[in-house]
UniProtKB/Swiss-Prot annotation:
This is Abl interactor 1. It comes from Rattus norvegicus. Keywords: Acetylation, Cell projection, Coiled coil, Cytoplasm, Cytoskeleton, Nucleus, Phosphoprotein, SH3 domain, Synapse. One of its GO terms (biological process) is postsynapse to nucleus signaling pathway. The t-SNARE coiled-coil homology domain is necessary and sufficient for interaction with STX1A. May act in negative regulation of cell growth and transformation by interacting with nonreceptor tyrosine kinases ABL1 and/or ABL2. May play a role in regulation of EGF-induced Erk pathway activation. Involved in cytoskeletal reorganization and EGFR signaling. Together with EPS8 participates in transduction of signals from Ras to Rac. In vitro, a trimeric complex of ABI1, EPS8 and SOS1 exhibits Rac specific guanine nucleotide exchange factor (GEF) activity and ABI1 seems to act as an adapter in the complex. Regulates ABL1/c-Abl-mediated phosphorylation of ENAH. Interacts with ABL1, ENAH, STX1A, SNAP25, VAMP2, EPS8, SOS1, SOS2, GRB2, SPTA1, NCKAP1/NAP1, the first SH3 domain of NCK1 and through its N-terminus with WASF1. Part of a complex consisting of ABI1, STX1A and SNAP25. Part of a complex consisting of ABI1, EPS8 and SOS1. Component of the WAVE2 complex composed of ABI1, CYFIP1/SRA1, NCKAP1/NAP1 (NCKAP1l/HEM1 in hematopoietic cells) and WASF2/WAVE2. Interacts (via SH3 domain) with SHANK2 and SHANK3, but not SHANK1; the interaction is direct. Interacts with the heterodimer MYC:MAX; the interaction may enhance MYC:MAX transcriptional activity. Residues 361-371, 378-387 have a biased composition (Pro residues).
Length: 476
């Protein structure tokens, strides 16, 4: 406060007086310099003296103005601080008044209320009678409690080992996720999937059925041939569909002897064979001691040597006479299918054997009974008597590829492999393929997601890889 008073009473008024005096002195100095320049003989010296007076006068006036301005700014700062202190005091007083008003209001509100008596009790009340601890009694673990829970297959429903039924595995219940619709223009699978669509299981053709009634051993005239032992490895099915073998088969990796078949002779063919069939048949011959049991089926499944099923009794639907490797003529398309004839597709472990064997024609198998059920759920027939594997000769697997001698005109020039469809598939998207069982597809690209890109009947598209199986040709 004293500093403010000193500024207002002493320093600021003295600064004003100094400025007024400087103004008067500047007027006198100007008059002197003018007269001196006019009267002096040495004009140059007079000019230099005038410059010196001018510089000194301006410096003196500037100093006085600076001192007065600093005093005024200091005065303003002191007054601003005093205003802030006054504002703080006023705010404190207003808050005190508000607190007093709130206290008075609460007191007035409390007068209008009534007192309430509350009894305080403990939140947790201990029980009057303590519970006695239960004695631990060990109970044995029952491992069969969860046997009937879930969708598992019971152990009792498994088929006995080495049954004679020629069963067929179900189509895979899952396929690779369908490609997104955005990839319609291109056949690439590089674009990430957005939403996985539910998987539609493939449909099973109605013409598949087991033939329990045909399990009787059909004896045919014995065949003698020189056997070449060749180990055959099992080809697992693709797409998680499990093993292609029957669940009861126990000789998957047993080497079997492959006799060398002779080229077709001019003798009479079997009555059930279609002479112009384009597809081949798979013949399995099993020789035991002095009798030979032959079973003919139009499929590509690997069977154990103990299989004695006669599966194709009527005229061959999907096959015809066995063509040798030297046959070059292209056969006409296969005859129409009878509706009730059981059919096995050209799948499985497909082989083409180029060998020679002296073979005599076998009598045709008997016609099938009329009461064969479709997909019979009855228990399988009892297994045949055990076979001595040392005296048993292995089966011959022959398959005539319709495109073995040359690829068709619509086949691509460069492809990864040639596959055969083992299930029917109907396309879900526009860039996919639709094909029937037994169709030949040329794979031109394999994607990491399980989908293949291939050509079938002049149509290029995508298809799940677990619906096809590779065609492998064996040569000597």
């Amino acid at each position: 406060m004293a500093e403010l008073q000193m500024l207002l009473e002493e320093e600021i008024p003295s600064g004003k007086r100094a400025l007024i005096e400087s103004y008067q002195n500047l007027t006198r100095v100007a008059d002197y310099c003018e007269n001196n320049y006019i009267q002096a003989t040495d004009k140059r010296k007079a000019l230099e003296e005038t410059k010196a007076y001018t510089t000194q006068s301006l410096a003196s006036v500037a100093y006085q103005i600076n001192a007065l301005a600093n005093n005024v700014l200091q005065l303003l700062d002191i007054q601003a601080s005093q205003l802030r202190r006054m504002e703080s005091s006023i705010n404190h007083i207003s808050q005190t008044v508000d607190i007093h008003k709130e206290k008075v209001a609460r007191r007035e509100i409390g007068i209008l209320t009534t007192n309430k008596n509350t009894s305080r009790t403990h939140k947790i009340i201990a029980p009057a009678n303590m519970e006695r601890p239960v004695r631990y009694i060990r109970k044995p673990i029952d491992y069969t409690v969860l046997d009937d829970v879930g969708h598992g297959v019971k152990h009792g429903n498994n088929q006995p080992a080495r049954t004679g039924t020629l069963s067929r595995t179900n189509p895979p219940t899952q396929k690779p996720p369908s490609p997104p619709v955005s990839g319609r223009g291109t056949l690439g699978r590089n674009t990430p999937y957005k939403t996985l669509e539910p998987v539609k299981p493939p449909t099973v053709p109605n013409d598949y059925m087991t033939s329990p009634a045909r399990l009787g051993s059909q004896h045919s005239p014995g065949r003698t041939a020189s056997l070449n032992q060749r180990p055959r490895t099992h080809s697992g099915s693709s797409g998680g569909s499990g093993s292609r073998e029957n669940s009861g088969s126990s000789s998957i990796g047993i080497p079997i002897a492959v006799p060398t078949p002779s080229p077709p002779t001019a003798g009479p063919a079997a009555p059930g064979a279609a002479p112009g069939s384009q597809y081949g048949t798979m013949t399995r011959q099993i020789s035991r001691h002095n009798s030979t049991t032959s079973s003919t089926s139009s499929g590509g499944y690997r069977r154990t040597p103990s299989v004695t099923a006669q599966f194709s009794a009527q005229p061959h639907v999907n096959g015809g006479p066995l063509y040798s490797q030297n046959s070059i003529s292209i056969a006409p398309p296969p005859p129409p299918m009878p509706q009730l004839t059981p059919q096995i597709p050209l799948t499985g472990f497909v082989a083409r054997v180029q060998e020679n064997i002296a073979d005599s024609p076998t009598p045709p198998p008997p016609p099938p009974p009329d009461d064969i059920p479709m997909f019979d759920d009855s228990p399988p027939p009892p297994p045949p008597p055990p076979v001595d594997y040392e005296d048993e000769e292995a089966a011959v697997v022959q398959y005539s590829d319709p495109y073995a001698d040359g690829d068709p005109a619509w086949a691509p020039k460069n492809y990864i492999e040639k596959v055969v469809a083992i299930y029917d598939y109907t396309k879900d998207k526009d860039d996919e393929l639709s094909f029937k069982e037994g169709a030949i597809i040329y794979v031109i690209k394999k994607n990491d997601d399980g989908w293949f890109e291939g050509v079938c009947n002049r149509v290029t598209g995508l298809f799940p890889g677990n619906y096809v199986e590779s065609i492998m040709h064996y040569t000597d």
